[in-house]
């Protein structure tokens, strides 16, 4: 059995947050007339994601002393802000419970350890948070909880209710149900999960703690001249390249998934900070606006929650490939017409969600279709006024209306 030692950490001062939720002056910050403390001074809803590399010892077991410090900092943060905690560590807790020195290779065995460890992990969190006068709630989620619109809205209502009561939701993916070998039902990683949660509750700030200081222009473990990137204002291809190519040590180390999380979060108006979890005090420092980690600056405009769900959570049933003119029109905020569609892939019905791709196969958007796959196959490349002549009827002039399209 794991031993739960209770150590109360003291000496932490309370943080003061401004109450204004969306009062960030992006222009001032970009022009250098505002620092991080001013920019983040109004955050009152924060998601903190902490991965296994921060929670675990070298052998994969949980580092309980580190966890005690993490809980102390999260509790302090919760004095003046709503906090959601996305945690890994269930497998490590299971290893400690079963006294295993090495993680098994079998997917089923790892799922079993996650099932065992989740009980130990949440019990440990409960004891430690109680010591700081905090109540927690557990949510184990799957991809379906996000893709199903009714479950998504219900989950949002539950989280809002918990936060209003100053309860700290502790969230993890339900690994025993959606293990690595089950495709299509797994979110994939807790970086993505934390970004989905941040979008769900419209968080002001997402803090991801990892085992390095933040983003570098190249792998600092390989290149001595690697430069630290303090601020990312525009997440472009140069930033994606800095995260490491797929299959490289740096990329498979997890920075690529954090960049994906940053893309998701910033498009929803949520600032994101990647910081080093070796010092748990960085949780508080990041929220206070101290110069820790890499700050990814949120977009100026928060997209509405329905479009965020459409872009990142809704399951798409098929896809359409569009020409350059249609792609340009989408980026300008216009609907997708049948004349711009070049290829229809998959089988789907009217009202289902599609992926919209350019000629190279790059995903541009997701949207709800006005026509089935069979109908689109007949009217692709046709002008809107020709639809009725081809089908014998016309639902809409647009194949997908801009109100039902979300760029990604």
Per-segment meaning from a language model:
Residues 32-102, 107-135, 139-408:
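C-terminal catalytic "cap/lid" subdomain
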Residues 1-2:
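Methionine residue identity
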Residues 6-7, 17-18, 351:
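Generic alpha-helical structural signal
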Residues 15-33:
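Short, Lys/Arg-enriched N-terminal segments with co-localized hydrophobic residues
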Residues 5-6, 164:
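Short N-terminal alpha-helical targeting/association segments
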